[in-house]
């Protein structure tokens, strides 16, 4: 059963995003600066659109934190939208004079749904005659709220169990980084300084070249990010039920990120292409205890963490707002048309890695809280240490 609960609210061009996280113990260190640092990382990446140049994330804690520490009550955080004054009437919660709205270009009905977005299916489901009410919430801007909560979860994981999380881009379009080269937490600063957050210099150059070409072609690109969690204790999750398996929870969380269309744990789909003798991680005795000689499983077996490096990948499709504009139908007229286009990224794969880090952090934080409990960080930390010290099989 989940110990933590989280929820976000807000629209892309609304006054703010808000998020709540319930179930954390007292004593987790967190400040607005810590959250702002991760939100700034979310704006990184070569190929981002103009919005990243002027978008600023104003972080305010509304509850659950006092003097830099959680209090054991629900944590509420707000990420303000500095562009709100431009949208105050278009996105107002209260009714606005129709004559005022009619004179606003930003309020023009969006009746040409974009292929690859939630536009058309959302309009059909909720009965809207234009896409604005759908795209405002479906926008990847919402991930800023999840990154904010992820910052809190990361602090909890590090303080209680010593878990640290890092991500990198392993594929962007046809450019690929060498397989099996895994960054550590010590590489984060170097990764964030790279234009595409890739550890391999040659692969990074190839990825930048792919983005440049796509920009010239009026196109967009997807890719694959890999998230690694170091220090994850053995035994998180469960083999008992499908919804308690940790890899299932990780996959669901990552698939919930906008534009993610595939997830694999460890070597994932590659394991389907090799015989069993080459697919599994053999177990050996070492001076440090019983270990696995490889990491093909990605640190989970049977829905449980193994104590080895946790490794997951997420595949992001190309951004659906394509500059060259794809074919669609204008729902107001029924005529063939080109899809609505606004400023967009050529690629947001590097940023997807930061969002994926946050989601992995939230899932692992939930699993740690579920396994070890505790009303304070001190109590949880003590429970973790006691568990690890008293494992019957090491």
Curated annotation (Swiss-Prot):
GO terms for biological process: amino acid biosynthetic process; aromatic amino acid family biosynthetic process; chorismate biosynthetic process. Pfam families: Chorismate_synt (PF01264). Pathway: Metabolic intermediate biosynthesis; chorismate biosynthesis; chorismate from D-erythrose 4-phosphate and phosphoenolpyruvate: step 7/7. FMN binds at residues 137-139, 258-259, 302, 317-321, 343. GO terms for cellular component: cytosol. It is an enzyme of class 4 (lyase). CDD domains: Chorismate_synthase. Its EC number is 4.2.3.5. It catalyses: 5-O-(1-carboxyvinyl)-3-phosphoshikimate = chorismate + phosphate. Reduced FMN (FMNH(2)). GO terms for molecular function: chorismate synthase activity; FMN binding. NADP(+) binds at residues 42, 48. It comes from the Bacteria. Keywords: Amino-acid biosynthesis, Aromatic amino acid biosynthesis, FAD, Flavoprotein, FMN, Lyase, NADP. Its cofactor is FMNH2. The keyword Manganese does not apply. PROSITE patterns: CHORISMATE_SYNTHASE_1, CHORISMATE_SYNTHASE_2, CHORISMATE_SYNTHASE_3. Homotetramer. Belongs to the chorismate synthase family. This reaction introduces a second double bond into the aromatic ring system. This is Chorismate synthase. It comes from Streptomyces coelicolor (strain ATCC BAA-471 / A3(2) / M145).
């Amino acid at each position: 059963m989940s110990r933590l609960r989280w929820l976000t609210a807000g629209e892309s061009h609304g006054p703010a995003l808000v998020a709540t996280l319930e179930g954390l113990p007292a004593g987790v260190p967190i400040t607005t600066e810590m959250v702002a640092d991760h939100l700034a990382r979310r704006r990184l990446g070569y190929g981002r659109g103009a919005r990243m140049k002027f978008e600023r994330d104003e972080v305010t804690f509304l509850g659950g934190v006092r003097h830099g520490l959680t209090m054991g009550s629900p944590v509420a955080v707000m990420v303000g939208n500095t562009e709100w004054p431009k949208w105050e009437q278009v996105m107002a919660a209260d009714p606005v004079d129709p004559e005022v709205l009619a004179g606003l270009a930003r309020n023009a009905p969006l009746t040409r749904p974009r292929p690859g977005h939630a536009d058309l299916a959302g309009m059909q489901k909720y009965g809207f005659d234009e896409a604005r009410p759908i795209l405002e919430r479906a926008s990847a801007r919402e991930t800023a709220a999840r990154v904010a909560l992820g910052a809190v979860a990361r602090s909890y994981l590090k303080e209680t169990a010593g878990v640290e999380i890092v991500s990198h881009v392993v594929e962007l379009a046809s450019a690929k980084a060498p397989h099996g080269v895994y960054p550590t937490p010590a590489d984060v600063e170097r990764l964030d300084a790279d234009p595409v957050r890739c550890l391999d210099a040659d692969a990074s150059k190839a990825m930048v070249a792919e983005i440049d070409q796509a920009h010239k072609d009026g196109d967009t690109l997807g890719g694959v990010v890999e998230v690694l969690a170091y220090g994850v204790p053995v035994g998180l999750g469960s083999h008992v039920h499908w919804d308690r398996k940790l890899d299932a929870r990780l996959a669901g969380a990552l698939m919930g990120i906008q534009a993610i269309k595939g997830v694999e744990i460890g070597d994932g789909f590659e394991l389907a292409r090799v015989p069993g003798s080459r697919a599994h991680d053999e177990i050996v005795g070492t001076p440090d205890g019983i270990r696995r000689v490889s990491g093909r499983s990605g640190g989970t077996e049977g829905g449980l963490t193994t104590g080895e490096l946790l490794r997951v990948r997420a595949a992001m499709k190309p951004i659906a707002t394509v500059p060259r504009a794809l074919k669609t139908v204008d729902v107001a007229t029924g005529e063939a048309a080109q899809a609505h286009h606004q400023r967009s990224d050529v690629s947001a794969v590097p940023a997807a890695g930061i969002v994926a880090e946050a989601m992995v952090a939230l899932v692992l934080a939930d699993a740690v809280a579920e396994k070890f409990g505790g009303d304070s960080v001190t109590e949880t930390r003590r429970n973790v240490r006691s568990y690890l010290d008293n494992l019957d099989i090491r």
